[in-house]
Structures are given as structure tokens and as C-alpha cells.
Amino acid sequence: MWCFNPRSSIEDLAKIQFWKALGAEFIGTAVLVYIGCGAAVTSTPDANRDAFVTRVSLAFGLTVATMVWAICGVSGGHINPAVSLGFLVTRRISLVRFLLYVAFQCSGAVAGAALLYASTFDSVKRGGFGTNSMATENGQYLISPAQGILIEAIITFVLVFTVFATCDAKRSDLKGSGPLAIGIAVLISHLVAIPLTGTSMNPARSLGPAVLIGFWTDHWVFWVGPMLGGAVAGLLYDMAFAADASLRKFGECAVADDYDPDADDRTIDTKRVNARV
């Protein structure tokens, strides 16, 4: 399937399963924001910083693991535009699926933030409300937006690389729970990055709280960094580290009209290759 071919997008729109998948992404992302950001806004970071970081890291990591487990059979359990981008650039989903996944993920994030806003006390609403921002001290930035992009790209790379590894159907060594491995990737990334950027690694997660309280300072960082990390991780794993990675797979991904990322035979039929400049 050539992911930018209108035919593949129309085929998606005609399937009832596709619309179920959109609903699953909406619910999964809403729950992620409500639980993850809820753990952040109901904590007191100044009292015990280490306990705060651990609490929030566990909340996000375990929620991701739970929701991926719950909806992976319906939508793939992306609940993150950066994950969806990784699947787009490796031609595993169509363009319309990517765009609507992101739209429903972002809508779900705003809905989750709205539910959190409606169910918490006023002092929480006057605070940062789980928004992401660069680390500061005495009103001065400790890291620059460029450093923020780098941090977010790295931790999102860890997440998406793990997602692709757990979804590699041709690996014979996979054991244990894939959703748990993905949740652990989120957890360990939060342990590192909460003191630096608040840890986004998910543009939708950053968008929800920002919409509710109107906080947009450096918000673009939490789109650029995660999307960059997600795209690089998806391409690198699929083309270099997957069980069936090869130069032939890379070539077919680049030029074949009906590329199948999970095909057993990687030989390219030259009659169906349509090279693009």
C-alpha cells in the first residue's frame, strides 16, 4: 500500500473498523491525559521533588501500558501523534488514517484535560495544570528551546523504537508483555525528563492542558521534538533493526506502489515499481 495513494485512504474511510479505531484513540488519549496529568496536578512537587517525579512517572507509564493493552486490538494503541507518524513514514498506515488518528488523539487529550479541570479544586486550576515547559530557576530558563527539542526527540525515540520492536511480527525472541515494555519506556523517560521539560513525548498530551489554561509558551517545542524523534525511530528500526530489515526492503519502501511492510518476500517486481524523484 502506498500510504499517499488516495485509494488506500478511501479504503480506510469505508471500513467500520476504522471508525472504531478512531474512537479507541480518542478514549485512550483522554484517559492518558486525565490520569497522567491528574497525578501531576494533585501532587506537591516542592514538598518532595523525587517523590513527585516518581509518582508522575508511574502514572504515565502504567496508564500507557494499560491503555495500549486495552485498545491495541482495535486501533493499534497509538494514543500519540509521534507514534502514528512513525507508522506513517514506514508506510504502515495511510495518510488519512494518520491525519484522523492525530485529530482524534488531540480531541481526546482536550476532553481528558477538560474532565480533569472539571473534577479538581481551584488551586490546581491556577497552577501549571500539567502543561509542559522548559525548566526554570528564579525566573530564568535553565535549558533552551533547542535543548528541549533534543530532549523530547531522544525520549520519544526511545518510546517509538520500543513500540516498533514489540510490534515486529518476525522476531522469534519476543516474550512477555508488549504493552508493559512500552509503558516502561514511557516511565523511564519521565524519570529523566520531568525536571527538564516536564516530559511530553506526546504532542497530544501537551496540547490538552495547554488548551484548558491557554498556556502556549514554547508549545511548539513539544510538537517538533516528539514528531522528529518518532519519525527517526520508526524509519531506523524498520529499515535497519527489524528482523527482516534489508536494502531490498528499504528500496521497496521507497519506490514500490503496493509496498507491504510485512511481506515475506523482499524481491521487487520491476513492473510495479514507480520511482519517484
From Swiss-Prot:
Keyword set, alphabetical order: Cell membrane, Membrane, Repeat, Stress response, Transmembrane, Transmembrane helix, Transport
Pfam families: MIP
GO cellular component: plasma membrane
Keyword Transport: yes
Membrane-spanning intervals of the chain: 21-41, 56-76, 98-118, 145-165, 178-198, 221-241
Induction (UniProt): Transcript abundance is high and expression levels are not significantly affected by desiccation or rehydratation.
UniProt GO molecular function: water channel activity
Residue ranges annotated as motif NPA 1: 80-82
PROSITE patterns with a match to the protein in the record: MIP
Residues spanned by motif NPA 2: 202-204
Membrane topology: Multi-pass membrane protein
Major localisation: membrane
Protein localization: Cell membrane
Keyword Calcium in record: no
InterPro entries with a match to the protein in the record: Aquaporin-like, Aquaporin_transptr, MIP, MIP_CS
UniProt record similarity statement: Belongs to the MIP/aquaporin (TC 1.A.8) family.
UniProt remark on domains: Aquaporins contain two tandem repeats each containing three membrane-spanning domains and a pore-forming loop with the signature motif Asn-Pro-Ala (NPA).
Main function: Probable water-specific aquaporin that may modulate the water content and osmolytes during anhydrobiosis.
Protein name: Aquaporin-5
Organism: Milnesium tardigradum
